[in-house]
Amino acid sequence: MTIMSDKWIKDAVIKQSMIRPFAEKQVRVHNKEKIISYGLSSYGYDARVSNEFKIFTNINSTTVDPKNFSEDNLVDREVDECIIPPNSFALGRTIEYFKIPRDVLVICVGKSTYARCGIIVNVTPLEPEWEGHVTLEFSNTTPLPAKIYANEGACQFLFLKSDQICDTSYAERQGKYMKQVGVTLPLT
């Protein structure tokens, strides 16, 4: 597998609408204020988090069960700044909608700005022919409240092109998170 460059990413956006909306260069300032950067980089794409968050809470004292997940575990917020409680977790989603080509696997890594503050972002790989908004998982590993900024950079996606086409794509096996819109909770 080969990591793909900014030139390839731009071409895939033009030919296949791989990322919508798409920022053709790194954006670091908005309305004369510094922001956490987003947009095209040399070998990846820094995506933004929307203002839609689901924050874990212990108000209802339920157990987190991935096979039988209860929305009572979460509080919904639409905010420009999401505060994650100490040692807690929040879900968000990208502003960008992705359509992954059949010969590509996408890996997500966190942004150093957040990582250096103890905020870790996790996303499982975007598989061949998957499409949708990406649900982002933010962990606050600190003993203090932590802030996530909506409409700013949250993570970087790296595009790996395979030497051969897979036999079965995510779309063909009817993956459960196909064409997800909004923050999507665990499905079994």
From Swiss-Prot:
EC assignment: 3.5.4.13
SUPFAM superfamilies (UniProt xref): dUTPase-like
InterPro entries (UniProt xref): dCTP_deaminase, dUTPase-like_sf, dUTPase_trimeric
Keywords: Hydrolase, Nucleotide metabolism, Nucleotide-binding
Biological process annotations from GO: dUMP biosynthetic process; dUTP biosynthetic process
An example molecular function term from Gene Ontology annotations: dCTP deaminase activity
Pathway(s) served: Pyrimidine metabolism; dUMP biosynthesis; dUMP from dCTP (dUTP route): step 1/2
Keyword Nucleotide-binding included in the entry's annotation: yes
Catalytic residues as annotated in Swiss-Prot or TrEMBL: E137 (proton donor/acceptor)
Binding positions for dCTP per the UniProt entry: K111, S112, T113, Y114, A115, R116, T135, L136, E137, Q156, Y170, K179, Q180
Entry-linked Pfam families: DCD (PF22769)
Reaction it catalyzes: dCTP + H2O + H(+) = dUTP + NH4(+)
Summary of the function given for this chain in its UniProt record: Catalyzes the deamination of dCTP to dUTP.
Subunit description: Homotrimer.
Family from the record: Belongs to the dCTP deaminase family.
PANTHER family, per the entry: DCTP DEAMINASE (PTHR42680:SF3)
Protein name: dCTP deaminase
Gene: dcd
